[in-house]
Amino acid sequence: MSQEIYDYANQLERAVRALPEYQKVLEVKEAIQADASASQLFDEFVAMQEKIQGMMQSGQMPTAEEQTSIQELSQKIEANDQLKAYFEAQQALSVYMSDIERIVFAPLKDLVK
């Protein structure tokens, strides 16, 4: 039985990769990488996101200046059709991932009831 669980996990991984929503994220990501300005904005977003997550993990909040930078970056991203499409595709994929997470972790949740 223990090997079966890994087979199921690998099957799930392949199924996620086959989802049209996953394929759309890949497609849009490739388009972003092919566009220098979109790629630069995406890299700025990732760097900003990592910085904010690090701050929050250490109990800090973004300063007013950092919040302004975040808003400005968000506006630039919203104005870029490729990045906008990427985040929309990510959102569609995240619906599946949230549902899968809920299903997979249900047995563990039962253990703490």
From Swiss-Prot:
Q: Name one Pfam family in it.
A: Com_YlbF
Q: Which domain of life is it from?
A: Bacteria
What InterPro entries would the database entry show? Com_YlbF (IPR010368), YheA/YmcA-like_dom_sf (IPR023378)
Segments crossing the lipid bilayer: none
Instruction: Give the record's family classification.
Output: Belongs to the UPF0342 family.
Q: Which HAMAP family match?
A: UPF0342
Q: What is this protein called?
A: UPF0342 protein M6_Spy0643
Organism, as annotated: Streptococcus pyogenes serotype M6 (strain ATCC BAA-946 / MGAS10394)
